[in-house]
A protein has these predicted regions:
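Substrate-binding cleft of extracellular glycoside hydrolase catalytic domains
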Residues: 2-123
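Acidic carboxylate-rich catalytic motifs and surrounding loops in phosphoryl-/glycosyl-chemistry enzymes
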Residues: 126-129
Length: 129
């Protein structure tokens, strides 16, 4: 079995030299949003997303779970990313130290699926005459 190295990237790592970083990892998990203390977008999301895409580094985006409304957090998360590309995935970071709320997580995941379906199929419009 080969080893896969995936790095957790957020504003806490500062500005990454993606040219050096590219060959060191198999992929990255980029923090997109969080809700610990209110909804927010990670300050380095756009930079990290764009640099990873430019260099062909596989990306998974994550949302750091808060304790608010699951549907609202899911919507904020999807909107902040600005669209997914082929092969990119979404991840929920649930670090409630053994107190996982399965119903909340399921509602979040269900709404993510609804949003992705709506974005994929409502994002293409054809007008003909």
């Amino acid at each position: 079995m080969s080893q896969i190295t995936v790095a957790d990237i957020s504003r806490w790592q500062g500005t990454i030299n993606w040219d050096q970083f590219k060959g060191a990892v198999s992929g990255v998990v980029i923090k997109a949003t969080g809700a610990d203390g209110g909804l927010y977008t990670d300050g380095m999301l756009a930079y990290n997303r764009d640099r990873a895409r430019e260099r062909g580094v596989p990306i998974w985006f994550y949302h750091y779970k808060g304790s608010g409304n699951a549907r609202q957090e899911a919507e904020y998360f999807v909107n902040a990313i600005g669209g997914l590309r082929a092969g990119e995935a979404l991840v929920l970071d649930d670090e409630n130290e053994g107190k996982v709320n399965v119903a909340w997580d399921a509602e979040f995941a269900d709404h993510i699926k609804e949003l992705i379906f709506r974005l994929r199929f409502n994002g293409i419009h054809i007008y003909t005459k």
